[in-house]
């Protein structure tokens, strides 16, 4: 996970949600040093175990009660159990990644600090900080409102189902630990999305630095070049020049139109620095995939199963009582789970797309640069880009990009048909 000046707010939110058991200290040079916090390590493990225990305790309470609120049929029991279990697995995997990925986190942030120093002229930490805080605030506010609406709806349904000597509202109370897990899950997704978005943002800034440093200047030089060549031709043809005058004209031409050897070397060093930064960003992508790959996998599975389960309960309600309040809440849950899926997929897709743009810019630079020193540096950068893979993956099982959305759409439709058929057969 990224722990930097722009994302420090998300880091503190993650600590409260048991996802970042680390401590940060600012050294004498002003840099943030990251280490393990044993207090928050114990806090993360304890909170996770307690919440998981209470969640399954509430699930069993509703399943074994005389009047179940959510588990009314055999199919609904299976769907609800899967719905709860996949959230639990996502939370456990996220906390596990936070507990055991300290080395990857240290390497990731060390690389990001060096990259930010290279791209210092294009950094805007203030805007990045507000974007990160805005993403976290909107996400947590949305899940708070949605959980409140859902609990209120189920409380109303439980009161309508209540009979003498039974307290169906207690069944809903036992689901509150499960709803609390959604806050941890949302914090985990905000953390991953912020890190992936930060990598994509740095890829984009590197591309802008490449374009402004090499393409803009070459375009200006090529626009001036014909005028200077024409001037030399007039001197040599219309008025016979003495050897000393001709030498002076050629010297002036070389000094004005061709970059000096020192300037070419400086540009070569700049290009090498940008190539190193691009390679380091690619390694940061792999570090994030390795450290949080299992969490991303369970998040994707949870999005898939939640979309299936929520749509299933929505169809059941449409075919039976048609409670308007319940229908609206289920539709809001579907929108939330879809946005939750996009929160993971879209930053990863944008980062990979910005990484692929770099090779297009380098190819354009290669066509316009003719100095031997620069041409060799551009060629090495181009060869490096041919083998760079900046795509995020979930434990190597699938690439996290927009193509996964079509697979999800077909899978949701298939599973919905199967569940509805089971419901009609078994009731």
From Swiss-Prot:
Outcome recorded upon mutating residue 266 to A: No effect on fructose-induced current
Highest taxon in the source lineage: Eukaryota
**Residues that bind Ca(2+), according to the entry?**
421
InterPro entries, per this entry?
7TM_chemorcpt
In alphabetical order, the GO MF annotations are: ionotropic sweet taste receptor activity; ligand-gated monoatomic cation channel activity; sweet taste receptor activity; taste receptor activity
Q: How does this protein lie in the membrane?
A: Multi-pass membrane protein
- For this chain's UniProt record, which GO biological process terms are given? adult feeding behavior; cellular response to fructose stimulus; chemosensory behavior; male courtship behavior; monoatomic cation transmembrane transport; regulation of appetite; regulation of feeding behavior; sensory perception of sweet taste
Pfam families tied to this protein: 7tm_7 (PF08395)
Report the GO terms under cellular component.
axon; dendrite; membrane; neuronal cell body; plasma membrane
Keyword Repeat (UniProt): no
Indicate which residues the UniProt annotation says bind beta-D-fructose. Answer: 70, 83, 182, 310, 337
Effect noted on mutating residue 353 to W:
Reduces conduit ion current amplitude significantly
Q: How does it assemble?
A: Homotetramer.
Per its database record, what is this protein's job? Gustatory receptor which mediates acceptance or avoidance behavior, depending on its substrates. Gr43a is the main sugar receptor in larvae. Functions as a narrowly tuned fructose receptor in taste neurons but also as a fructose receptor in the brain. Necessary and sufficient to sense hemolymph fructose and promote feeding in hungry flies but suppress feeding in satiated flies.
Q: Which PANTHER family match?
A: GUSTATORY RECEPTOR FOR SUGAR TASTE 43A-RELATED, INVERTEBRATE GUSTATORY RECEPTOR
Q: Which named protein is this? A: Gustatory receptor for sugar taste 43a
| Biological source species | Drosophila melanogaster
């Amino acid at each position: 996970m990224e722990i930097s000046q722009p994302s420090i707010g998300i880091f503190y939110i993650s600590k409260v949600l048991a996802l970042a058991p680390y401590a940060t200290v600012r050294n004498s040079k002003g840099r943030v040093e990251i280490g393990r916090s044993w207090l928050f390590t114990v806090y993360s493990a304890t909170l996770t175990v307690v919440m998981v225990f209470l969640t399954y305790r509430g699930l069993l309470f509703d399943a074994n009660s005389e009047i179940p609120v959510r588990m009314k049929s055999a199919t609904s029991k299976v769907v609800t159990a899967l719905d709860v279990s996949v959230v639990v697995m996502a939370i456990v995997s996220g906390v596990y990644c936070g507990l055991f990925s300290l080395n990857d986190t240290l390497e990731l942030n060390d690389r990001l600090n060096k990259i930010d120093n290279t791209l210092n002229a294009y950094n805007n930490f203030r805007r990045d900080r507000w974007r990160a805080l805005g993403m976290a605030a909107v996400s947590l506010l949305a899940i708070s409102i949605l959980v409140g609406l859902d609990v209120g709806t189920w409380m109303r349904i439980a009161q309508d189902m209540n009979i003498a000597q039974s307290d169906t509202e207690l069944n809903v109370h036992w689901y509150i630990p499960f709803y609390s897990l959604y806050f941890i899950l949302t914090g985990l997704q905000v953390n991953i999305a912020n890190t992936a978005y930060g990598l994509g943002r740095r890829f984009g800034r590197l591309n802008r630095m490449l374009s402004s440093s090499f393409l803009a200047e070459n375009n200006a030089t090529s626009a001036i070049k014909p005028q200077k060549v024409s001037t030399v031709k007039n001197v040599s043809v219309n008025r016979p020049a003495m050897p000393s005058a001709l030498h002076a004209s050629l010297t002036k031409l070389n000094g004005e139109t061709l970059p000096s050897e020192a300037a070419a070397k400086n540009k070569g060093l700049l290009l090498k620095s940008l190539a190193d930064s691009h390679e380091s960003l690619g390694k940061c992508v792999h570090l994030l995939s390795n450290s949080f790959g299992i969490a991303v996998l369970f998040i994707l599975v949870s999005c898939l199963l939640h979309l299936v389960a929520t749509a299933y309960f929505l169809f059941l309600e449409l075919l039976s009582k048609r409670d308007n309040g319940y229908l609206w809440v289920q539709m809001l849950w579907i929108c939330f789970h879809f946005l939750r899926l996009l929160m993971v997929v879209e930053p990863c897709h944008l980062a990979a797309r910005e990484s692929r743009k770099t090779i297009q810019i380098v190819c354009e630079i290669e066509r316009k640069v003719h100095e031997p020193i620069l041409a060799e540096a551009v060629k090495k950068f181009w060869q490096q880009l041919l083998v760079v893979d900046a795509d995020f993956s979930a434990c190597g099982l699938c690439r996290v990009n927009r193509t996964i959305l079509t697979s999800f759409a077909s899978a949701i439709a298939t599973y919905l048909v199967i569940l509805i058929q089971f419901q009609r057969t078994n009731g």
